[in-house]
Structure formats: structure tokens, C-alpha cells
A protein has these predicted regions:
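Acidic/histidine-rich, surface-exposed loop or edge segments in extracytoplasmic proteins
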Residues: 24-40, 83-84, 205-206
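C-terminal/domain-edge helix-coil "capping" segments
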Residues: 1-26, 113, 125-227
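N-terminal segment of the mature soluble domain
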Residues: 37-128, 172, 176, 182-185
């Protein structure tokens, strides 16, 4: 059977059309920090590569993208003034400190640039099972993926429990205007970060060696996250 063009797991985006109409967005900057929960370390390492692809996508779609280092410099200066909003032990975000820092960054960037919006690109880890249909596909946030296999061996153990949840990653995009009000948010699936371990007799998932290695999947996740 042919796969449907619309994936029912497509994320329900939020858009404030009135704010966007009142002040159209042309010039943006991609933040190097997360808006929500901190990304897992193994995903955080891949974030600069994903951000570079997001920047290319935005430029192709007619936006002017300011260098991330501009944001980073102002962010670091504001952190020196107000403290780090992220608790290094728990990874929790202090929203009050975060708001103070963002207000300072906004004020500084408004002086020196024609910035219209800040874009946050969080790599979020979710869970999905490869339990759908004979091909064992997982669907989440608009994508359909088949499982990866890792390690020596031939195929998947007959005892493998396809209902086990595997770690998957999505790109969460949040856009804030110069009033620091949310104008858009959505999420696009990228790929599973777990693979089926062929060395296990009963079958289990292990972390993939090559995380976010498929550029096409990243591009699809970006496209979905901006729609």
C-alpha cells in the first residue's frame, strides 16, 4: 500500500498570525541555547551542525540570518550580569533569570541590528515504538522511520519485543519577536537515536554510534518544524 502523504503524527503548530502581520519577520538570529529543557549531552554535541542547516534553510526561504556568535556574545555578557539560568546539576532552567538575560540580549541587539526575531532550536529526545505494520515503522512528529540495526549478526531475534520504546529525536522550533512574545512554535521528527542490538539474543535497543548522521532526515525535520 502507498504511504499517505499526510502523517497523522504531524505536530500541531502554534502561530500568532496577528502579531506576524503587524510586524513581519525578515531578520532573525538562531540562539545557541535551548528554550526549554536542556538537550541530552549526546544531542547537544550535534546542535551546531543542525543550527547550520536551519540557517541555510531560512536563507533559502528569504530570511536574513545574523551570525549566531552575535547572540552568543550578548548572551555571555548577560550571564555574567545575572548568572547562569541553567542549574548545572539538575539541568533545570530558571525562567526568571532566563527572561532577564533575554531582555538584555534583545536590548543590545536592537541597538546594533535590524533584528526582528529570535529562533530557538531545541533537540528534544522522545520515545516511540517500531510496532506499526509488517515493516515495523515508528511514526512521530510527522515522520515515518524504520529501525536501524547495530552490531554483528543477521537480522532481528524472533523474540524481539517490538512494543519496547526507543529513543527518538525531534527538532523543536520556537520563534519570539522583539517584544519577546511567542509568534510560532512547532516540532519536526528527525530520527531514532537507538538501534536494535543484534548481539542480544532476545533483542534490545542500544544508542546508535552515528547520531543525526542522515542529512536528508535532518532536512525533513527542519522542514516539518517550520510548518
Amino acid at each position: 500500500s502507498s504511504t499517505p502523504t499526510y502523517n497523522p503524527t504531524t505536530f500541531p503548530f502554534q502561530l500568532d498570525q496577528a502579531r506576524l502581520d503587524a510586524r513581519p519577520i525578515k531578520t532573525v538570529v538562531i540562539a545557541h541555547v535551548n528554550l526549554g529543557v536542556q538537550s541530552r549531552n549526546y544531542l547537544d554535541k550535534e546542535a551546531p551542525r543542525v543550527d547550520a542547516q536551519v540557517a541555510s534553510y531560512l536563507k533559502e526561504n528569504g530570511f536574513k540570518v545574523l551570525p549566531q556568535r552575535d547572540f552568543e556574545q550578548h548572551w555571555n555578557a548577560a550571564v555574567r550580569a545575572f548568572g547562569n539560568p541553567v542549574d548545572p546539576t539538575s539541568g533545570k532552567l530558571n525562567r526568571k533569570t532566563f527572561a532577564l538575560i533575554m531582555t538584555r540580549v534583545r536590548d543590545e541587539m536592537a541597538k546594533s541590528t535590524k533584528l526582528d526575531a529570535f529562533i530557538f532550536t531545541d533537540l528534544v529526545e522522545l520515545e516511540a515504538s517500531f510496532s506499526e505494520g509488517l515493516k515495523h515503522v515508528a511514526r512521530w512528529d510527522g515522520v515515518t522511520r524504520t529501525p536501524s540495526l547495530q552490531g554483528p549478526g543477521d537480522g532481528v531475534s524472533a523474540e524481539f519485543d517490538w512494543n519496547i520504546l526507543a529513543a527518538v529525536v525531534s527538532l523543536q522550533v520556537s520563534i519570539y519577536d522583539m517584544d519577546l512574545e511567542p509568534v510560532f512554535s512547532s516540532r519536526g521528527g528527525i530520527e531514532a537515536t537507538d538501534a536494535i542490538d543484534r548481539r542480544s539474543s532476545t533483542g534490545r535497543y542500544v544508542r546508535r554510534r552515528n547520531i543525526l548522521g542522515n542529512e536528508t532526515y535532518i532536512a525533513e525535520g527542519i522542514r516539518l518544524a517550520f510548518h
